[in-house]
Amino acid sequence: MAPSFDHLRDEDLDEEDFDMDEVDISDLREKYEVQLEQGYDTFVVVDGLPEVNADQKPKLVKFLLKKLNSVGRVSEDSVYMPMGDNGLSLRFAFVEYSSPAEAAAAVRQLDFTPLDKKHTLRVNKMTDVDRYGREGRIEEEYTAPKIEEFQEKEHLRSFMADPSERGRDQFVMFRGETVGVFWNNEKDQPENIVDRQQWTETFVQWSPQGTYLTSVHAQGVLLWGGASWARLRRFPHPFVNLVAFSPNEKYMVTWSNRPISIPDSGHPALSLDDDGKNYVIWDLETSKPLRSFAQQDTPATGDDAAKKSAKFPWPAFKWSADDKYVARLNQGTSISVYELPKMNLMDKTAIKIEGVMDFEWAPATPRRDGVKTYEQLFCFWTPEIGSNPARVGLMSIPSKQIVRSLNLFSVSDVKLHWQSDSAYICVKVDRHSKSKKSQATTLEIFRVKEKGVPVEVVDTIKDTVINFAWEPKGDRFVIITTPEPVGAVAVAPKTSVAFFCPEKAKGNAIGNFKHLRTLDKKNSNAIYWSPKGRFVVVAAIANTQSSDLDFFDVDFEGEKPEGEKDLTANLQLMNTSEHYGMTDIEWDPSGRYVATWASSWKHVMENGYHLYDFRGELLREEAIEKFKQWSWRPRPATLLTKEEQKQIRKNLREYSRVFEQEDADRISSADVAVVEARRRLLLEWVTWRESMEEELVEDRAALGLPEDPVAELLRQKTAAITPAAGEEQEEQVVEEIMEEVLEESEEIVN
């Protein structure tokens, strides 16, 4: 039992013998000591203010507070505006925010903000002013800056000028620890451009227009390009995992699963405001960070949310087609749209959409009928909440106007699929029965360019759609369906591949979407359209039962079946191939070639690649140990006008004759070169053989041996069997026995 007060001795209560200094409370002091803020992290300096007198000063401060409070909390007492000896202000002010994060936000969002028509605010951190403006840092006398001589830089689009004048495309291969960039030579060995060891630590990635090659390292991201493949940009984001570019290569977002930790010594690019963040958005031109964000916890929504493992959303930040906006989903509550390049939240608030699950920007700037003002569109969907139906909506930015919405019922899941020109968006709706034991899919197709954005419903699909793909720059699409529920099973279920296209209509109108044809009992699970349209590959990816590739032409020039003459497609299976262990497929940007490969990242069996032409003919295959990645280099958009492109298509047959002749000449010259090389090698061998024979004759003569040993042996053997002169040759009798069958019969005895 613990001692009570009554059990204490008198000496235990004697305060005179008690010495406070003998008690060690350092651990308690360290744990509970209040940390007083030190330094000027919460202060900013605002320059560019108008010159006012003492009477005008309060009005200016109140007017300035409207700007300052847009990014944080500032009171009137937190603004100090020094006055000069002449009674007028010095045109700047010191402002104290409630936290360093608010001060950093003020610098980021208010710098270069116009106060009125004549004055523009310049906002800087007090710590920066102290660091760079400290005594001794600034010289008293002005020294003109040294202007370096102009040095011409390499053209970053030089890859568009193929030195062979054959219009070849480039690709990158990552195998083992080596990364190489090559010219595609069809059936021949690829022509190596550059090959480097340890070029990346995880993977490589092209920018959307092919200008940069991205390498990923523990210290951050590097961009490479130009004819010499020099390092062009550096983005220090520690332990970066993923990278995504804006469509026009103006910005980039990096993500790391580890929050950023800024050391006491500082960071070369990031600040304390970025500490604890996972995402960083960068300006590619300046290589500077625009803003950073922390990882979001995905909220649970719906009855089955707890049962389903949450998938990591990537890309978490999605770009508008013109790079003017980037948006982020706050699942279940809102969508935050930021204006670039300042990364200000549009209208200073997120767009509230109750229950929102996903959204997708239009991939091209839309041109809706009757709408002449600038806009970008994104499509979003919300699930059924209580008695409210699920909803799909099209929102215009920056007006935030809902231009079209659609209510849906009995919804299990929704996927959004934009067509490349933003002419359509297909909303793939997985619906469940009342018992929730079976599922079926309907396709809700929004015709975005038509007046009023009409919606066409394709509800003839009885099974669940597991894959959907629009034809690029076209209006046909392919789906893959399965009657069985999709899940982790030992044997993948059989699938069906269905083709859809519009029916013919008068003028330039697009008819209703009709079913073209279905191919049953397939193992396919992936669809890959040519970037130029018309040709499509349907394949079985990462399937242990099958590795088939089917090459289709939807504009076959042969005769159409009678029942399909009113449709805008003519389907033809051109070829079927197989690549065992195939994990990935990618078309080249010209739509002429298809690469398939088996990556060691997914398995280690028969790693390597196959190269096909658009018809499905195998051009080249190569097994490479530890083969990891293949990626075609993208091309920027063409500079030709539509009329120029139309004229080229019109004269394509004439160009084709020239190209075919050039190909034939190249093959012929290659054959001639091979024959000449072989003839040269044969001549060298014959010359060497003759010289060896001459040396051998000389050596035999020196040793007293016959010049031709074979002839000497024959002479000796002939002499041994030939009788000497005057001797009679003994007669020899040769008997020959011959057997002839006159008749043959067969008898069977029981």
UniProtKB/Swiss-Prot annotation:
> Which Gene Ontology terms of cellular component type are present?
cytoplasmic stress granule; eukaryotic 43S preinitiation complex; eukaryotic 48S preinitiation complex; eukaryotic translation initiation factor 3 complex, eIF3e; eukaryotic translation initiation factor 3 complex, eIF3m; multi-eIF complex
Q: Where is the RRM domain?
A: 42-128
Task: List, in alphabetical order, the Gene Ontology terms for molecular function in this entry.
Answer: identical protein binding; RNA binding; translation initiation factor activity; translation initiation factor binding
Q: What InterPro entries does the entry give?
A: EIF3B (IPR011400), eIF3B_RRM (IPR034363), Nucleotide-bd_a/b_plait_sf (IPR012677), RBD_domain_sf (IPR035979), RRM_dom (IPR000504), TIF_beta_prop-like (IPR013979), WD40/YVTN_repeat-like_dom_sf (IPR015943)
User: Is-annotated flag, keyword Signal?
Assistant: no
Subcellular location(s) of the protein: Cytoplasm
Identify the stretches annotated as WD repeats. 195-234, 236-292, 309-348, 519-562
Superkingdom field: Eukaryota
Which keywords describe this protein according to UniProt? Cytoplasm, Initiation factor, Protein biosynthesis, Repeat, RNA-binding, WD repeat
Pfam families recorded: eIF2A
User: Which GO biological process annotations does it have?
Assistant: formation of cytoplasmic translation initiation complex
Subunit structure and binding partners: Component of the eukaryotic translation initiation factor 3 (eIF-3) complex.
What family does this belong to? Belongs to the eIF-3 subunit B family.
Role according to the record: RNA-binding component of the eukaryotic translation initiation factor 3 (eIF-3) complex, which is involved in protein synthesis of a specialized repertoire of mRNAs and, together with other initiation factors, stimulates binding of mRNA and methionyl-tRNAi to the 40S ribosome. The eIF-3 complex specifically targets and initiates translation of a subset of mRNAs involved in cell proliferation.
Cited HAMAP family: eIF3b
What is the designated name of this protein? Eukaryotic translation initiation factor 3 subunit B
Q: Which organism is it from?
A: Chaetomium globosum (strain ATCC 6205 / CBS 148.51 / DSM 1962 / NBRC 6347 / NRRL 1970) (Soil fungus)
Gene that this polypeptide is encoded by: PRT1
